[in-house]
């Protein structure tokens, strides 16, 4: 089933909840970039988190960019997510694999902390008007969810819980997705409600398991986690938003990027390489430019 995102409020509008499934999206990214299991999971989590952040943007063309800059062997990670449900992303070292570590429940898990190393999470929110808003926070764990929650608390002053997860077996990635829970000003003034919400979030011991049990139904995930808070989709009756991996790169854009190199550099490429080859970082699409096309491009710059 196709990936989807659903928005809801709970507790009479005092709590905002967003759930997203990204299984198909993550599997597509894995095939495009040739990702290992570790980098598949890290990119899947980052794409889920990016979509959760973009879900609150006021305009349909608004976008959020997440960039992990660190000294870890993953060599960086970048995600571009839109309010429209379209997302793309890549990692610097797609084939990275590390030995598993023991998680809190005693099971073997991915070593996100070693993969990410120490560094920062950079977030840019672009509403399509004026200057984009950017913020940087130190990485908390490299697990993505904790890092994004830290960003929301320190940069947007919004108490939030962010859960991202996945399930993998011998057949590959089975599920991927995320859940965002935010306390709105109305609820912040009700200590009992805040305490109940915190209790529900603490009860989420294994988000990946809950995600897998809900399959491709994000609305069931919300009902399962918060049954006593009366979650309601917003706006009522709105179909869930489709989510997909989408990159707007094109041959025309690639040719435009080549012109930025200038005629001298292009002439050198024509003489020595007899053409040019460009690869999109976000989707690994390769664009080849032959001699005639490169010569015409140089002529257009004269």
Curated annotation (Swiss-Prot):
Pfam families: HSP33. It is found in: Cytoplasm. GO terms for biological process: protein refolding. GO terms for cellular component: cytoplasm. Disulfide bonds join 247-249, 280-283. InterPro entries: Heat_shock_Hsp33, Heat_shock_Hsp33_C, Heat_shock_Hsp33_N. The keyword Zinc applies. Its main location: cytoplasm. SUPFAM superfamilies: Hsp33 domain, HSP33 redox switch-like. Belongs to the HSP33 family. Redox regulated molecular chaperone. Protects both thermally unfolding and oxidatively damaged proteins from irreversible aggregation. Plays an important role in the bacterial defense system toward oxidative stress. This is 33 kDa chaperonin. It comes from Synechococcus sp. (strain WH7803). The lineage of its organism: Bacteria, Bacillati, Cyanobacteriota, Cyanophyceae, Synechococcales.
